[in-house]
Design a protein with these regions (language model features):
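Flavin (primarily FAD) cofactor-binding/catalytic cores of flavoenzymes
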Residues: 1-24, 53-156, 160-354
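Redox-cofactor-proximal catalytic regions of oxidoreductases
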Residues: 20-47, 75
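A short acidic, helix-capping loop that chelates divalent metal ions and anchors anionic groups
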Residues: 47-53
């Protein structure tokens, strides 16, 4: 957004809760590479350097974001966590944790899906003598070496953290609650993201059929290992429920090889481990909660008509000068959706000023 507004010559104020550029990416685990190809993951007006790999690494991504901020003279007001945004007398009134106040005719919310970690509660958690950490704080396997570790949740983050731990010879367990759609990152030498962009132009039934065939050929039947495939195709899951399938980076091979053991849902915590839904006592000394996030928009944004029951914006362009960027899920990936939404939103902002 900031780059597009700068390019359009539109003045803006950018409030940032943290004290650095790209804070959410800085906090990601060390092994991170984008799951989407660089062609569809860049910011406006500035493609990734040709020297970068197809799937950009964390260090390269951070370098790129800092260069972008310098190029477009993006200077956020750091340490300004918004605690209230309300529309009054024709303007948005914004209050930050510092007590500072701002007013604007137009407000763009770009805090994303992953603003507030979701931490489910289980009976007995207080009795557990081990370590419980949310995936947001996970960096690398070092603190878990020699400690049997349970990862709860098999989304993309949980699958990759389990892989990271297993590759460091940490005894690794992965709790999977229900059926999971898993797709390969690449299939027969081609990024699946590119295939998804082509498939979405087809009738849904045909695209779903192709997705199922690719999934069956690349991933296969994992029911013997405790993972079941849902009836809905990966494309339908994304299309109808905005849920991205798990993009496999090697977790499936580790499961088949026995380096990651899949277990059922957790029923309760014990002093020396957890009790699973099937009654089995699993002896672990560390648990990583890969249990997702919530947007937390309703915590500060007083615009209930703009949000769904799950707290997700209903549309990028709402009423009364309110806009959202980064809350949609295209088949081509979240970063590509941010690129598209930001273009629409800037166009709407500029047209509202004429």
């Amino acid at each position: 957004m900031a780059g597009r507004l700068t390019e359009a010559g539109r003045a803006y104020t950018l409030l940032e809760a943290s004290n650095r550029i790209a804070d959410s990416w800085e906090r990601h685990y060390d092994r991170l590479h984008l799951h989407t190809i660089k062609r569809y993951s860049a910011l406006p007006y500035r493609p990734f350097p040709a020297s970068y790999p197809t799937y950009v690494a964390k260090a390269d991504l951070l370098r790129y974001y800092h260069d972008y901020a310098a190029t477009y003279r993006i200077r956020p007001r750091f340490g300004q966590r918004v605690i209230r945004a309300v529309h009054e007398t024709g303007r948005w009134r914004i209050t930050t944790q510092r007590g500072d106040q701002f007013a604007a005719k137009q407000l763009v919310v770009a805090t994303g899906f992953n603003r507030v970690p979701h931490r489910p509660s289980w009976p007995g958690t207080a009795d557990f003598r081990g370590v419980v950490a949310h995936s947001r704080t996970y960096q690398n396997p070092e603190p878990f070496l020699g400690r049997p570790t349970l990862v709860i949740g098999m989304g993309n983050t949980g699958a990759e953290i389990a892989l990271d731990l297993s590759e460091a010879d940490v005894p690794t367990y992965l709790s999977v609650r229900g059926p999971v759609n898993i797709v390969p990152r690449d299939f027969r030498g081609r990024p699946v993201q590119q295939t998804a962009r082509l498939v979405r132009r087809l009738p849904h039934w045909l695209g779903d059929w192709i997705g199922n065939r690719v999934q069956a050929a690349a991933i296969g039947d994992l029911s013997a290992y405790g993972i079941h495939t849902p009836r809905e195709s990966p494309a339908r899951q994304l299309r109808e429920r905005a849920r991205t399938p798990v993009i496999d980076l090697g977790t499936v091979a580790a499961i088949r090889a026995g380096r990651i053991r899949v277990v059922p849902d957790v029923d309760r915590f014990l002093a020396a481990g957890v009790q699973l839904a099937d009654g089995f006592h699993l002896d672990v000394s560390a648990v990583v909660l890969a249990t997702g996030y919530r947007t937390g928009l309703a915590d500060f944004l007083e615009a209930p008509d703009a949000l769904s029951g799950e707290g997700i914006p209903r549309t990028a362009i709402a009423r009364r000068g309110l806009y959202f960027v980064g809350f949609d899920a295209f088949a081509s990936g979240l970063l590509d959706s941010i690129y598209r939404d930001s273009e629409r939103v800037v166009r709407a902002i500029l047209s509202a000023q004429t």
